[in-house]
Design a protein with these regions (language model features):
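Intrinsically disordered, low-complexity regions enriched in serine/threonine
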Residues: 6-210
């Protein structure tokens, strides 16, 4: 759901919106989870969850009126956080970057997935080499995304952040899952309250620090 009066341009014709996301509980343990999430409307990338925006959990025993009251009591505060988030991305727009900085961000973002790991280069001879960040499926796709982002938006920290986010919002999916609607649902769940939410937030921190 869109939050009233919570839309701002990061740059010309590049609006971002604050949205209230409601996800029902699959196991019926609670009624629903609610988060406030920052979206880029041009490609509908989830940019990041707002700081300290852990999902609100509504128990079935709470009244509807009490739930609504809880939401209304924090919306104004979240609008302030959204404005701060917009300023972060405006700063990224002004940060031109080089290939070495792209490498730095991707290496740090996926450090645990390549560090101290091996890649088999010959199964018959059982030879291996050290794994590096370029071996990762995520990085290969993100590098392709960056070619388009840099062409459209320049070589900026903002373009780098969007190239990473686009992968998690529109491209990630297990190769054994062929149904795109199922892949999209899994991506959404991981982005809202799963491991991908942390990766998206970390990518913003790394790009902002360049």
């Amino acid at each position: 759901l869109a939050v009233d009066n919570a839309i701002q341009d990061v740059k010309q014709d590049d609006p971002h919106k604050l949205r209230l996301v409601i996800v029902s509980s699959h196991d019926s343990s609670v009624s629903c989870h609610i988060s406030f999430i920052h979206f880029r409307m041009f490609c509908f990338n989830q940019m990041n969850k707002l700081k300290d925006s852990n999902p609100l959990t509504f128990k079935h025993t709470r009244s509807i009126n009490e739930n609504v009251s809880r939401i209304n009591s924090i919306i104004d505060f979240k609008k302030g956080e959204f404005t701060k988030s917009i300023q972060d991305y405006k700063l990224m727009v002004r940060k031109e970057i080089k290939e070495e900085q792209v490498k730095e961000v991707l290496e740090r973002l996926y450090f645990d997935k390549w560090n101290n790991k091996k890649v088999c280069i010959d199964r018959t001879l059982k030879t291996e080499r050290d794994k590096n960040y370029l071996d990762l499926v995520e990085v290969k796709q993100i590098k392709e995304n960056l070619e388009k982002e840099f062409e459209q938006n320049g070589r900026t920290a903002y373009a780098l952040c969007n190239g990473i986010n686009y992968y998690y919002n529109h491209q990630q999916g297990a190769s054994n899952i062929k149904d795109e609607s199922t892949r999209a649902r899994i991506r959404m769940e991981q982005n809202y309250y799963g491991k991908n939410a942390n990766i998206i937030d970390k990518s913003k921190e790394l790009c902002l620090a360049l």
